[in-house]
UniProtKB/Swiss-Prot annotation:
<comment type="subunit">
    <text>Complex I is composed of 45 different subunits.</text>
</comment>
<protein>
    <recommendedName>
        <fullName>NADH dehydrogenase [ubiquinone] 1 alpha subcomplex subunit 8</fullName>
    </recommendedName>
</protein>
<feature type="short sequence motif" description="Cx9C motif 3">
    <location>
        <begin position="78"/>
        <end position="88"/>
    </location>
</feature>
<feature type="domain" description="CHCH 1">
    <location>
        <begin position="33"/>
        <end position="74"/>
    </location>
</feature>
<feature type="disulfide bond">
    <location>
        <begin position="78"/>
        <end position="110"/>
    </location>
</feature>
<comment type="function">
    <text>Accessory subunit of the mitochondrial membrane respiratory chain NADH dehydrogenase (Complex I), that is believed not to be involved in catalysis. Complex I functions in the transfer of electrons from NADH to the respiratory chain. The immediate electron acceptor for the enzyme is believed to be ubiquinone.</text>
</comment>
<keyword id="KW-0679">Respiratory chain</keyword>
<feature type="domain" description="CHCH 2">
    <location>
        <begin position="75"/>
        <end position="118"/>
    </location>
</feature>
<dbReference type="GO" id="GO:0045271">
    <property type="term" value="C:respiratory chain complex I"/>
</dbReference>
<dbReference type="InterPro" id="IPR016680">
    <property type="entry name" value="NDUFA8"/>
</dbReference>
<keyword id="KW-0496">Mitochondrion</keyword>
<feature type="disulfide bond">
    <location>
        <begin position="46"/>
        <end position="56"/>
    </location>
</feature>
<comment type="similarity">
    <text>Belongs to the complex I NDUFA8 subunit family.</text>
</comment>
<dbReference type="GO" id="GO:0044877">
    <property type="term" value="F:protein-containing complex binding"/>
</dbReference>
<dbReference type="GO" id="GO:0005743">
    <property type="term" value="C:mitochondrial inner membrane"/>
</dbReference>
<keyword id="KW-0677">Repeat</keyword>
<dbReference type="GO" id="GO:0009060">
    <property type="term" value="P:aerobic respiration"/>
</dbReference>
Length: 172
């Protein structure tokens, strides 16, 4: 029935949260974006195609798992330079990167040496990319209604309006 809404169970919704502050997210954003790019884009593609977040729970869990794994790797390999970097961002005015370039360089060097991750160039993550996915295409990806029948053809001569146009100020 179209009136019944099926909600996911609590077990389906249960995931371990990524409990970090905005400064930590901002400090890790460039490397996180590079490492979890495919899972994030696949999740956003699912959300755009399905228009229903309940159908994208599996992809959402993969995004969450990627984020948790990313922060665990940072914590185990580069905890000290990362803490200096996000603390600098947290205490700087409006979390601006320009105040913390020295800490950023130390963190980027640590990540490069120990994990082999190169900081992506500016604009690299915002480029348009194609996402290869194993999900089937939705039946109606644009959620559009069926097209209505065209108006019937009017037979006979059409006469001009009796009192002119509706836009009276145009005809004066």
């Amino acid at each position: 029935m179209p009136g019944i809404v099926e909600l996911p169970t609590l077990e389906e919704l249960k995931v371990e949260e990524v409990k970090v502050s905005s400064a930590v997210l901002k400090a890790a954003a460039h490397h996180y974006g590079a490492q979890c790019d495919k899972t994030n884009k696949e999740f956003m593609l699912c959300r755009w195609e399905e228009k229903d977040p309940r159908r994208c729970l599996k992809e959402g869990k993969l995004v969450n798992g990627c984020a948790l794994n990313f922060f665990r790797q940072i914590k185990s390999h580069c905890a000290e330079p990362f803490t200096e970097y996000w603390t600098c961002l947290d205490y700087s005015n409006m979390q601006l990167f320009r105040h913390c370039r020295q800490q950023q360089a130390k963190f980027d060097q640590c990540v490069l040496d120990k994990l082999g991750w190169v900081r992506p160039d500016l604009g690299q993550l915002s480029k348009v990319t194609k996402v290869k996915t194993d999900r089937p295409l939705p039946e109606n990806p644009y959620h559009s209604r069926a097209r209505p029948e065209p108006n019937p053809v009017i037979e006979g001569d059409l006469k001009p309006a009796k009192h002119g146009t509706r836009f009276f100020f145009w005809t004066v």
